[in-house]
Amino acid sequence: MKMNLINIPLILKGYPIHKAFKTLIKIKNLSISEFEEYIKCKQSEIVNFHIRHNQFYKEIVKNENWRWEDLPVLTKRDIQVELDVRIPSLIKSYYINKTSGSTGTPFYFAKDKFCHALTWANIQSCFSEHQVYGKKQARFYGISQNKKEYLYDRMKDFFLNRYRFNVFNLSENSFNNWVVNFSKIKYVYLNGYTSVLVLFSKYLQSKNLVLKEICPSLKKCIVTSEMCFKEDKLLMEKYFGVQVINEYGASELDLIAFQNKENEWLINTSTLFVEILDNHNNPVPDGQSGRIVITSLYNKANPFIKYDVGDIGSIQRINAKKVILKKLEGRNDDYVILADGTKAIGLTFYYVIKSIIEKKNSIKEIKIKQIEIDFFELEYVSDKVLTNTQKSEINIEMIKFLNYEVKVDFKKLNHLKRTKRGKLKQFTSLINKT
């Protein structure tokens, strides 16, 4: 992996990026049998480190003679204590950041500098496989409105050779300006929130435009942070004119999975250990959905050990080194609460309704809220108002999915409310919040 000039800020801040590259290459060159032993050693090493040097984690585990299967599964709520409480005194220099994730509640986390350098090395490795790392990026993420954080983000954009588009204005006029921008600048790839890029592709569809014809230098599109449904991916590939690559990550951990050239969604097995567990914390068979639980094998600043990231998914293990993320089904706290008290995954429900509603009208975006067991609110952005017949048909399909009578309040909006960083929460059950 070739060292890039954009690593200079990391080096100046004391991040051992050279060492991280060498370590990552060494890991990737291990044989399968060597890799199996490597994982066992790293699991033991990170757990023992935090038990010996991290009083916070020691009190959670309560047993120095631990077994992997008996270690507690931690949630964000378990770890969300003051940073100085969960950082070992042995660690003097570390990286601090925060993420609101899907909850909207700020979550501060820390990584030791080597761990953070490994994250960057891993990102560069994945992006370099597609020959886009360090190339001109059209970036579709939100930006902090805090002046200091805003300036820092802009500085990062400059060093990382990227231009950040305003994802808080998704009007037709704004999209038109984006197209003009692409006609003037030689972007190599797009990178951003799935919902924003889907909306942009729908605008291109309405104008019968293909972005690559406007900007011939385009090679790839990388989507992340939100679910990317198959139909949306095909739409983006058609109107962007390039391959769409799925990325799945968590700021507090690392890059979790990244799509390779063969369209396999490869799990990052180099620095993370990923498990799929049932509600009793037992591993589920390959291909079966469960809670995604991850261990950061290198983070000595915070104990992200058997950490429930809050998502539902399934994997396929080819061998210890090669693990494929087969399905990502969304957040495990975003359930539709059914009349009999059982639950269905909210994004599955959202997808069914989305597929139906987009056939009925020129719908651009939808957002579903479950207000009560039998009452839903459906917000949508469209050039046309849904007719009473269309509303009735959608209501009937919702009843078929849920298997009981429900009422739906349809609200046509000019734009849907997003988080402060520009993400769209596509399904919410307010019942879960009580």
Positions of predicted regions on the chain:
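Residue-level signal for inorganic ion chemistry
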Residues: H50, T99, Q137, L190, ...
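Nucleotide 5′-phosphate-binding alpha/beta core
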Residues: M1-K98, T103-K136, I143, K184-N191, ...
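Conserved adenylate-forming
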Residues: S144-N268
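AMP-binding/adenylate-forming catalytic core of the ANL superfamily
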Residues: L190, Y298-Y404
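Short coil/loop residues immediately preceding or within conserved phosphate-binding loops
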Residues: Y94, T271, I363
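Generic structural signal for residues in well-ordered beta-strands
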Residues: R162, V244, V274, K407-F410
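Conserved AMP-binding/adenylate-forming
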Residues: K219, V223, M227-I318, N332
